[in-house]
Amino acid sequence: MLKYAIIFAIISLIAGALGFTGVAAGSAAIAKVLFVVFLVLAVLFVVLALLGIGAARKAIK
């Protein structure tokens, strides 16, 4: 589960970088939405991993 948190964090950073560098005006709005969505997912998966819920329990043991 921690693997997914890292993946979501990387995706959010890439989406933000592509949207805020002026690649295209339309991609900035999409990047903002994707950044928020994947950032929330990354934080959620980190919290779940710290609590030992789901697949993170097996990864820790």
From Swiss-Prot:
Enumerate the subcellular locations listed in this protein's record, separating them with semicolons. Cell membrane
Membrane-protein topology: Multi-pass membrane protein
Which cysteines link up through disulfide bonds?
none
Quote the InterPro entries the UniProt record gives.
Answer: DUF1328
Q: Does the keyword Hydrolase apply?
A: no
> What sections of the protein cross the membrane?
5-25, 33-53
Pfam families given for it?
A: DUF1328
Q: Which GO terms describe its cellular component?
A: plasma membrane
Keyword annotations for this protein, in alphabetical order, are:
Cell membrane, Membrane, Transmembrane, Transmembrane helix
Domain of life according to the entry: Bacteria
Family classification: Belongs to the UPF0391 family.
Query: In its UniProt entry, what is this protein called?
Result: UPF0391 membrane protein Ajs_0703
Q: Give the source lineage, highest ranks first.
A: Bacteria, Pseudomonadati, Pseudomonadota, Betaproteobacteria, Burkholderiales
